[in-house]
A protein has these predicted regions:
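Conserved GNAT acetyl-CoA-binding A-motif
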Residues: 113-124
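Conserved acetyl-CoA-binding loop-helix of GNAT-fold acetyltransferases
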Residues: 89-92, 98-111, 138
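Conserved beta-strand in the GNAT
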Residues: 58, 64-73, 91
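A short helix-loop-beta-strand connector motif used in the catalytic cores of GNAT acetyltransferases and
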Residues: 43-58, 86
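Conserved GNAT-fold acetyl-CoA-binding loop/helix
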Residues: 22-44
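A short beta-loop-alpha structural element at the N-terminal edge
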Residues: 2-16
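Glycine-rich phosphate/pyrophosphate-binding loop shared by adenosine-nucleotide-utilizing enzymes
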Residues: 1, 63-68, 85
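Conserved active-site alpha-helix within GNAT-family acetyltransferase domains
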Residues: 103, 115, 127-145, 150
Length: 152
């Protein structure tokens, strides 16, 4: 398996992966996520790849893209300033899970974050995504905060 930087030629494969996540979210929380044909328009994808504060990776097995990840470099707004590598999205193809691909992708993010001068890696995961919560805990991450809601 090869982990490499994402290119504009990866759009169709990445869109397929992102739709897997979006469809799972829509099944779990239809009040928050509506079904859609594409996770993001091609133009938005291209803009992300051109953004100097965003890095995107794919995991490739033979000719197949089996995982993708978007990471933004942010400056902390806390009293203790630190650069943060924020994982916007990390998706492993459902047919390829439980094979260490997510762990390898996460390790690549860590290497990139250290080289970029980040002091920590952060991400947000919805509480209905127990698979992701379990994976991130196994990678050494710990919960930072919770957001609560009440439907009126």
């Amino acid at each position: 398996m090869l982990i490499r930087r994402m290119t504009k030629w990866d759009y169709d494969a990445v869109d397929r992966l992102l739709l897997q996540l979006q469809q799972a979210d829509a099944r779990s929380r239809p009040d928050m996520f509506a079904p859609m044909a594409h996770y993001m328009p091609r133009e938005s994808f291209d803009c992300l790849l051109e953004n100097d504060n965003v890095v995107a990776f794919v995991a490739q097995e033979r000719l197949d893209i089996v995982a993708c990840c978007f990471v933004s470099l942010l400056d902390s707004s806390s009293a203790h300033p630190v650069k943060i590598a924020y994982i916007d999205l990390l998706v492993v193809d459902a047919a390829h899970r439980r094979r260490g691909i997510g762990r390898r992708m996460f390790a690549e993010v860590g290497r990139y974050a250290r080289r970029a001068g980040a002091g920590k890696v952060e991400l947000t995961v919805y509480s209905h995504n127990k698979i992701a919560e379990s994976a991130y805990s196994a990678y050494g991450m710990a919960p930072q905060r919770s957001i609560y809601e009440m439907t009126l």
